[in-house]
Amino acid sequence: MLESESRCETTANQSSSDVDKLKKTKDNLEWVARFNISLNEDMERHYGFCDAMCKIAVAMFGTYAFASLFIGKSIAYSVCGVVVTALSILTLVVDFKEKQIRAKSQRNRYSSALASVDSVKDESDCKALNELLFEIGKDDLPSGTICDALAINAAIDQMGRDVTYKANVGTFKRITRYIIPWGAPKYGHR
């Protein structure tokens, strides 16, 4: 009688640890998806802003340079013409709109992966979802450590995790995260 009871107890402990392991794996997969959604959302906003600002600047300086043909020529008009040319070349070479669309596509792919986290029932589903997240990640745009830190902070907020693990990103680093990407945040307790 004691031997059968110990077998049942061992089986119950194994299934409990399997459930805990599955829950932890699902939690990690949700973390990865939320982190990447936040990161791609940030990039989408940034590249959309850059695209809009370049278009506005080209329109303003272009109008100013075109008006110089009718008003008269001076150094200021020539400088505006050079600025328009430089901004036009910048938008053609960097193509902010394409990067914005790519970041939005990645965000949507990660969102659909996040939606499937709840349907994970066993370890094979976890492996399949992990492979899907890995495949999606192959197409990610490069990001800096400050962008990653802000995405980590957003994922911590979304999942209700302990705020002591949030990265301390200063205002200057937050504003210049795409211009000066090599800055490093401070992690840990504040």
How would you describe each model-predicted region?
Residues 2-60, 90-190:
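Conserved non-transmembrane functional hotspots
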Residues 58-66, 84-88:
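Hydrophobic, membrane-inserted alpha-helices
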Residues 64-83, 91-92:
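Hydrophobic alpha-helical transmembrane segments
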Residues 70-75, 98:
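Membrane-interface helix caps and helix-loop-helix hairpins in membrane proteins
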